[in-house]
Regions:
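Histidine- and acidic-residue-rich, metal-dependent catalytic cores
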Residues: 4-208
């Protein structure tokens, strides 16, 4: 399908720009898939299967806005200055803008909306202290709340230019501590229940 080709192309562009996060897009997409499958069978959160399939499909586009960030900022190993942090934060709104243009000719409003929301709002926080809009709780589109869990978890358990990888125990503890503040508490609880599958995913990826 045309949509699939576009998404694959976008993901490749982002990965080529930000190789310091090596494999982040593939890993977060796999995490989203695991959580989405959990949600498909959940009684606590009722979401349409077609919607969750769409979220899985658009997950690779969440960091598209990073193509507009200078390499010096994108790959900086140390702490950002205020100006650099502001530039880095701009990737979410920029990604949403680019996706809107790229998918303008694709006849799938649901996919476009989900892709824009995932890119724009995956750094929002449940308590309203995220960016770029400072949305809180259910003001944040659910697809972005799902993406936020995958994005942060992968950042925790992966080595970055500014940190070593955290172990599973520490990473899951940080996610648990963030329920109701950084993360949707219900989605977060279901995410924690996916721990066996998530650990298996990362162990298998490490072995490849």
């Amino acid at each position: 399908m045309v949509q699939d080709s576009i998404i694959t192309g976008i993901a490749s562009v982002v990965e080529s720009r930000d190789n310091s996060t090596g494999g982040h897009i593939n890993r977060t997409s796999a995490v989203v898939k695991i959580l989405a499958k959990k949600l498909m069978n959940s009684q606590e959160v009722v979401l349409e299967r077609d919607f969750l399939d769409t979220v899985i499909k658009v997950a690779p586009m969440h960091d598209l806005g990073k193509v507009a960030i200078d390499d010096v900022v994108l790959r900086k190993p140390g702490k950002f200055t205020e100006e650099e942090y502001a530039k880095m934060k701009s990737h979410s709104a920029e990604g949403a803008r680019v996706i809107q243009k790229v998918l303008a000719e694709v006849d799938d409003e649901d996919m476009t909306r989900a892709a824009v929301n995932v890119a724009h709002f995956h750094h929002e926080r449940w308590d309203g202290r995220g960016y770029p809009e400072g949305l809180k709780e259910e003001q944040i589109p659910v697809e972005a709340r799902i993406m936020a869990l995958a994005d942060v978890f992968d950042a925790l358990v992966s080595k970055r230019c500014y940190k070593e990888a955290f172990g599973f125990d520490r990473a899951f503890s940080i996610i648990e501590e963030g329920l109701g503040t950084q993360f949707d508490p219900v989605l977060g609880k279901l995410f924690l229940e996916c721990r066996p599958e998530l650990e298996r995913l990362y162990i298998e990826m490490e072995e490849k």
